[in-house]
Protein backbone atom coordinates (compact mmCIF):
# COMPACT_ATOMS: atom_id res chain seq x y z
CA UNK A 1 0.00 0.00 0.00
CA UNK A 2 1.36 3.40 -1.02
CA UNK A 3 1.47 5.91 1.84
CA UNK A 4 2.25 9.60 2.23
CA UNK A 5 5.69 8.54 3.48
CA UNK A 6 6.42 7.08 0.02
CA UNK A 7 5.26 10.29 -1.66
CA UNK A 8 7.40 12.35 0.70
CA UNK A 9 10.47 10.25 -0.06
CA UNK A 10 9.98 10.56 -3.83
CA UNK A 11 9.29 14.30 -3.68
CA UNK A 12 12.10 14.99 -1.23
CA UNK A 13 9.91 16.64 1.39
CA UNK A 14 8.43 15.73 4.77
CA UNK A 15 5.14 13.91 5.34
CA UNK A 16 3.48 17.03 6.81
CA UNK A 17 4.49 18.94 3.66
CA UNK A 18 2.85 16.23 1.51
CA UNK A 19 -0.38 16.59 3.50
CA UNK A 20 -0.37 20.37 3.21
CA UNK A 21 0.54 20.35 -0.48
CA UNK A 22 -2.19 17.89 -1.48
CA UNK A 23 -4.88 19.92 0.26
CA UNK A 24 -3.71 23.11 -1.47
CA UNK A 25 -2.35 24.82 1.62
CA UNK A 26 -1.05 28.24 0.50
CA UNK A 27 1.81 28.03 3.01
CA UNK A 28 3.42 25.56 0.61
CA UNK A 29 5.05 27.12 -2.45
CA UNK A 30 3.56 26.42 -5.87
CA UNK A 31 6.74 24.67 -7.00
CA UNK A 32 6.63 22.33 -4.02
CA UNK A 33 2.91 21.61 -4.50
CA UNK A 34 3.57 20.69 -8.11
CA UNK A 35 6.50 18.45 -7.14
CA UNK A 36 4.40 16.65 -4.54
CA UNK A 37 1.49 16.24 -6.94
CA UNK A 38 3.80 14.73 -9.60
CA UNK A 39 5.13 12.27 -7.02
CA UNK A 40 1.60 11.36 -5.91
CA UNK A 41 0.50 10.86 -9.52
CA UNK A 42 3.53 8.70 -10.27
CA UNK A 43 2.70 6.45 -7.31
CA UNK A 44 -1.08 6.53 -7.87
CA UNK A 45 -1.44 7.84 -4.32
CA UNK A 46 -4.83 9.07 -3.14
CA UNK A 47 -5.05 10.42 0.44
CA UNK A 48 -7.74 8.82 2.57
CA UNK A 49 -10.66 10.90 3.77
CA UNK A 50 -9.66 10.15 7.36
CA UNK A 51 -6.13 11.29 6.77
CA UNK A 52 -7.33 14.41 4.96
CA UNK A 53 -9.67 15.38 7.78
CA UNK A 54 -6.90 14.93 10.33
CA UNK A 55 -4.31 16.83 8.31
CA UNK A 56 -6.54 19.87 7.84
CA UNK A 57 -7.20 20.27 11.55
CA UNK A 58 -5.32 23.24 13.00
CA UNK A 59 -5.64 23.44 16.77
CA UNK A 60 -3.08 26.16 17.64
CA UNK A 61 -2.11 24.01 20.61
CA UNK A 62 1.40 22.83 21.51
CA UNK A 63 2.11 19.88 23.79
CA UNK A 64 5.04 20.23 26.21
CA UNK A 65 6.43 17.01 27.68
CA UNK A 66 7.91 17.56 31.16
CA UNK A 67 8.06 14.43 33.29
CA UNK A 68 9.09 16.03 36.61
CA UNK A 69 7.62 19.41 37.52
CA UNK A 70 8.92 18.99 41.09
CA UNK A 71 12.38 19.82 39.73
CA UNK A 72 12.89 23.60 40.23
CA UNK A 73 14.66 23.74 36.86
CA UNK A 74 11.57 23.22 34.71
CA UNK A 75 9.26 26.01 35.94
CA UNK A 76 11.91 28.49 34.79
CA UNK A 77 11.59 27.07 31.27
CA UNK A 78 7.81 26.84 31.18
CA UNK A 79 7.09 30.56 31.68
CA UNK A 80 9.25 31.88 28.81
CA UNK A 81 8.13 28.99 26.60
CA UNK A 82 4.47 29.82 27.23
CA UNK A 83 5.00 33.53 26.54
CA UNK A 84 6.86 32.94 23.26
CA UNK A 85 4.26 30.46 21.99
CA UNK A 86 1.49 32.87 22.93
CA UNK A 87 3.13 35.61 20.87
CA UNK A 88 2.85 33.31 17.86
CA UNK A 89 -0.80 32.53 18.58
CA UNK A 90 -0.36 29.11 20.19
CA UNK A 91 -1.61 27.74 23.49
CA UNK A 92 0.46 25.37 25.60
CA UNK A 93 -0.61 22.00 27.03
CA UNK A 94 1.55 20.26 29.64
CA UNK A 95 2.13 16.50 29.64
CA UNK A 96 3.50 15.59 33.06
CA UNK A 97 3.43 11.79 33.10
CA UNK A 98 6.38 10.19 34.88
CA UNK A 99 7.30 8.05 31.87
CA UNK A 100 7.54 8.72 28.14
CA UNK A 101 5.64 5.49 27.49
CA UNK A 102 2.65 6.89 29.34
CA UNK A 103 2.88 10.14 27.37
CA UNK A 104 3.11 8.33 24.04
CA UNK A 105 0.01 6.28 24.83
CA UNK A 106 -2.17 9.32 25.48
CA UNK A 107 -4.68 10.27 22.83
CA UNK A 108 -3.68 13.90 23.18
CA UNK A 109 -0.35 13.18 21.52
CA UNK A 110 -1.88 13.06 18.04
CA UNK A 111 -3.43 15.58 15.68
CA UNK A 112 -5.28 17.26 18.55
CA UNK A 113 -2.10 19.33 18.86
CA UNK A 114 0.04 20.98 16.19
CA UNK A 115 3.46 20.22 17.64
CA UNK A 116 5.41 19.00 20.66
CA UNK A 117 8.23 20.37 22.81
CA UNK A 118 10.31 17.52 24.28
CA UNK A 119 11.97 18.83 27.45
CA UNK A 120 12.86 15.53 29.12
CA UNK A 121 14.05 13.24 26.33
CA UNK A 122 16.44 10.39 27.05
CA UNK A 123 19.04 8.73 24.84
CA UNK A 124 17.32 5.97 22.92
CA UNK A 125 13.87 7.40 23.60
CA UNK A 126 11.14 6.07 21.31
CA UNK A 127 8.93 9.11 21.68
CA UNK A 128 10.57 11.11 18.83
CA UNK A 129 10.03 8.16 16.48
CA UNK A 130 6.39 7.94 17.59
CA UNK A 131 5.94 11.62 16.81
CA UNK A 132 7.53 11.24 13.38
CA UNK A 133 5.21 8.34 12.57
CA UNK A 134 2.26 10.49 13.55
CA UNK A 135 3.65 13.33 11.40
CA UNK A 136 3.78 15.64 14.41
CA UNK A 137 6.44 18.37 14.36
CA UNK A 138 8.59 18.48 17.49
CA UNK A 139 11.61 20.21 18.98
CA UNK A 140 14.11 19.14 21.64
CA UNK A 141 14.48 21.56 24.55
CA UNK A 142 17.56 21.22 26.79
CA UNK A 143 17.94 17.48 26.12
CA UNK A 144 18.19 15.44 22.92
CA UNK A 145 17.56 11.79 22.18
CA UNK A 146 20.99 11.00 20.79
CA UNK A 147 21.88 11.03 17.10
CA UNK A 148 18.51 12.00 15.65
CA UNK A 149 18.60 14.99 13.28
CA UNK A 150 15.88 17.25 14.65
CA UNK A 151 15.24 20.83 15.67
CA UNK A 152 16.81 21.50 19.05
CA UNK A 153 17.62 24.30 21.48
CA UNK A 154 20.38 22.97 23.73
CA UNK A 155 23.43 24.02 25.74
CA UNK A 156 27.05 23.17 25.01
CA UNK A 157 27.16 20.84 28.00
CA UNK A 158 30.60 19.47 27.20
CA UNK A 159 32.08 22.97 27.21
CA UNK A 160 30.40 23.68 30.53
CA UNK A 161 32.01 20.61 32.07
CA UNK A 162 35.41 21.65 30.71
CA UNK A 163 35.06 25.14 32.19
CA UNK A 164 34.47 23.66 35.64
CA UNK A 165 37.44 21.29 35.33
CA UNK A 166 39.77 24.10 34.27
CA UNK A 167 38.66 26.31 37.16
CA UNK A 168 39.18 23.57 39.73
CA UNK A 169 42.62 22.76 38.32
CA UNK A 170 43.63 26.43 38.43
CA UNK A 171 42.47 26.60 42.06
CA UNK A 172 44.85 23.76 42.88
CA UNK A 173 42.36 20.96 43.48
CA UNK A 174 43.51 17.41 42.79
CA UNK A 175 41.13 15.22 44.82
CA UNK A 176 37.93 15.84 42.90
CA UNK A 177 34.55 14.09 42.77
CA UNK A 178 31.53 14.28 40.50
CA UNK A 179 27.84 13.80 41.27
CA UNK A 180 26.13 13.65 37.89
CA UNK A 181 22.77 13.12 36.28
CA UNK A 182 21.52 9.96 34.57
CA UNK A 183 23.87 8.46 31.99
CA UNK A 184 20.89 7.92 29.66
CA UNK A 185 20.43 11.68 29.25
CA UNK A 186 22.52 13.83 26.93
CA UNK A 187 22.82 16.47 29.64
CA UNK A 188 24.17 14.00 32.18
CA UNK A 189 26.49 12.25 29.75
CA UNK A 190 27.89 15.36 28.01
CA UNK A 191 28.54 17.32 31.20
CA UNK A 192 30.45 14.42 32.72
CA UNK A 193 32.36 13.85 29.49
CA UNK A 194 33.44 17.49 29.27
CA UNK A 195 34.45 17.45 32.94
CA UNK A 196 36.54 14.31 32.50
CA UNK A 197 38.22 15.70 29.38
CA UNK A 198 39.02 18.97 31.12
CA UNK A 199 40.53 17.18 34.11
CA UNK A 200 42.54 14.91 31.83
CA UNK A 201 43.99 17.93 30.03
CA UNK A 202 45.18 19.17 33.44
CA UNK A 203 46.67 15.79 34.33
CA UNK A 204 43.99 14.99 36.90
CA UNK A 205 42.16 11.69 37.08
CA UNK A 206 38.55 11.04 38.07
CA UNK A 207 38.31 7.49 39.45
CA UNK A 208 34.93 5.80 39.24
CA UNK A 209 34.74 5.48 43.03
CA UNK A 210 34.62 9.28 43.14
CA UNK A 211 31.59 9.43 40.85
CA UNK A 212 27.91 9.09 41.71
CA UNK A 213 24.99 9.34 39.29
CA UNK A 214 21.25 9.59 39.64
CA UNK A 215 18.19 11.66 38.78
CA UNK A 216 18.67 15.41 38.58
CA UNK A 217 17.22 15.91 42.06
CA UNK A 218 18.04 16.87 45.65
CA UNK A 219 18.29 13.27 46.89
CA UNK A 220 20.98 12.42 44.32
CA UNK A 221 23.16 15.22 45.65
CA UNK A 222 22.53 14.53 49.31
CA UNK A 223 23.01 10.78 49.05
CA UNK A 224 25.91 11.08 46.61
CA UNK A 225 27.99 13.39 48.79
CA UNK A 226 27.19 11.37 51.92
CA UNK A 227 28.56 8.24 50.23
CA UNK A 228 31.64 10.05 48.90
CA UNK A 229 32.44 11.52 52.31
CA UNK A 230 32.28 8.03 53.81
CA UNK A 231 34.96 6.81 51.37
CA UNK A 232 38.69 6.47 52.03
CA UNK A 233 39.61 9.77 50.34
CA UNK A 234 37.67 12.95 50.93
CA UNK A 235 37.58 15.26 47.92
CA UNK A 236 38.37 18.95 48.14
CA UNK A 237 35.99 19.78 45.28
CA UNK A 238 32.79 18.36 43.79
CA UNK A 239 31.21 19.19 40.43
CA UNK A 240 27.47 18.49 40.38
CA UNK A 241 25.50 17.76 37.21
CA UNK A 242 22.96 20.48 37.94
CA UNK A 243 22.11 23.05 40.61
CA UNK A 244 19.45 20.90 42.28
CA UNK A 245 22.00 18.11 42.83
CA UNK A 246 24.45 20.73 44.11
CA UNK A 247 21.92 22.05 46.62
CA UNK A 248 21.39 18.50 47.88
CA UNK A 249 25.16 18.11 48.24
CA UNK A 250 25.33 21.49 49.99
CA UNK A 251 22.87 20.31 52.62
CA UNK A 252 24.70 16.99 53.04
CA UNK A 253 27.95 18.87 53.65
CA UNK A 254 26.34 20.95 56.38
CA UNK A 255 24.82 17.84 57.97
CA UNK A 256 28.28 16.23 58.15
CA UNK A 257 30.09 19.28 59.46
CA UNK A 258 31.89 19.99 56.19
CA UNK A 259 32.39 23.71 55.59
CA UNK A 260 31.80 25.20 52.15
CA UNK A 261 34.04 26.50 50.68
CA UNK A 262 36.72 26.15 53.40
CA UNK A 263 36.68 22.34 53.36
CA UNK A 264 34.90 21.65 50.10
CA UNK A 265 34.42 23.55 46.84
CA UNK A 266 31.02 22.92 45.24
CA UNK A 267 30.01 23.88 41.68
CA UNK A 268 26.68 23.28 39.94
CA UNK A 269 25.22 23.69 36.44
CA UNK A 270 22.23 25.66 35.01
CA UNK A 271 22.23 28.76 37.25
CA UNK A 272 18.60 28.50 38.27
CA UNK A 273 17.47 31.55 40.31
CA UNK A 274 17.73 29.54 43.55
CA UNK A 275 21.49 29.20 43.00
CA UNK A 276 21.95 32.93 43.60
CA UNK A 277 20.06 32.92 46.89
CA UNK A 278 22.22 34.19 49.74
CA UNK A 279 21.64 30.92 51.61
CA UNK A 280 23.58 29.09 48.88
CA UNK A 281 25.61 31.56 46.81
CA UNK A 282 26.29 28.64 44.49
CA UNK A 283 29.10 28.87 41.94
CA UNK A 284 27.69 27.35 38.79
CA UNK A 285 27.61 27.16 35.00
CA UNK A 286 25.31 29.81 33.57
CA UNK A 287 23.30 30.13 30.36
CA UNK A 288 20.08 31.99 29.60
CA UNK A 289 17.25 29.62 30.58
CA UNK A 290 14.56 31.93 29.24
CA UNK A 291 16.21 32.44 25.86
CA UNK A 292 16.76 28.67 25.57
CA UNK A 293 13.03 28.07 25.99
CA UNK A 294 12.07 30.91 23.64
CA UNK A 295 14.38 29.58 20.93
CA UNK A 296 12.78 26.14 21.19
CA UNK A 297 9.37 27.75 20.68
CA UNK A 298 10.60 29.70 17.65
CA UNK A 299 12.12 26.58 16.08
CA UNK A 300 8.89 24.63 16.51
CA UNK A 301 6.71 27.40 15.08
CA UNK A 302 9.10 27.63 12.13
CA UNK A 303 8.72 23.89 11.57
CA UNK A 304 4.92 24.00 11.77
CA UNK A 305 4.38 27.06 9.60
CA UNK A 306 7.14 26.70 7.02
CA UNK A 307 6.16 26.60 3.35
CA UNK A 308 8.57 23.77 2.72
CA UNK A 309 10.30 21.29 4.98
CA UNK A 310 13.32 23.14 6.42
CA UNK A 311 16.51 21.40 7.41
CA UNK A 312 16.65 20.64 11.14
CA UNK A 313 18.23 23.49 13.05
CA UNK A 314 20.22 22.94 16.24
CA UNK A 315 20.79 26.11 18.26
CA UNK A 316 23.70 25.65 20.67
CA UNK A 317 23.96 28.02 23.63
CA UNK A 318 27.42 28.84 24.98
CA UNK A 319 27.70 28.61 28.78
CA UNK A 320 29.92 30.56 31.13
CA UNK A 321 31.14 30.01 34.67
CA UNK A 322 29.61 32.20 37.38
CA UNK A 323 31.70 32.25 40.56
CA UNK A 324 29.91 33.07 43.80
CA UNK A 325 30.60 31.80 47.32
CA UNK A 326 31.05 28.01 47.13
CA UNK A 327 34.54 27.78 45.61
CA UNK A 328 38.01 28.37 47.04
CA UNK A 329 41.66 27.67 46.25
CA UNK A 330 43.57 24.84 47.90
Language-model regions: role of each:
Residues 1-60:
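N-terminal helix-turn-helix DNA-binding module of bacterial transcription factors
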Residues 61-166, 170:
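Alpha-helical recognition/docking segments in bacterial nutrient-uptake
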Residues 113-120, 177-179, 211, 232-242, ...:
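Periplasmic-binding protein-like
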Residues 49, 67-76, 94-103, 153-163, ...:
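Hinge/beta->alpha junction and helix N-cap segments in small-molecule ligand-binding domains
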Residues 226-227, 231-330:
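Flexible loop/turn connectors
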Residues 15-20, 55-69, 76, 80, ...:
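Short beta-strand segments enriched in small/hydrophobic residues
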Residues 46, 86-91, 137, 174-175, ...:
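Residue-level detector of anion-binding/catalytic polar loops
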Amino acid sequence: MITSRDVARLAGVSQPTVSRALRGDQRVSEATRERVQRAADALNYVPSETGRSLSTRVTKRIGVVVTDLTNPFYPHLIGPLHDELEQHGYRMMLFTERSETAVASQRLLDRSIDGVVLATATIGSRLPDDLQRRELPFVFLNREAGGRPADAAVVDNELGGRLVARELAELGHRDIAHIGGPAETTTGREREMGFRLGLSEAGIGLPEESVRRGPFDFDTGYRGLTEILAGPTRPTAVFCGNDVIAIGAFNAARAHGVRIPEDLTLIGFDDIPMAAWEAFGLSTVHYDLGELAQEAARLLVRRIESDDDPEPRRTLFTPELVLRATHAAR
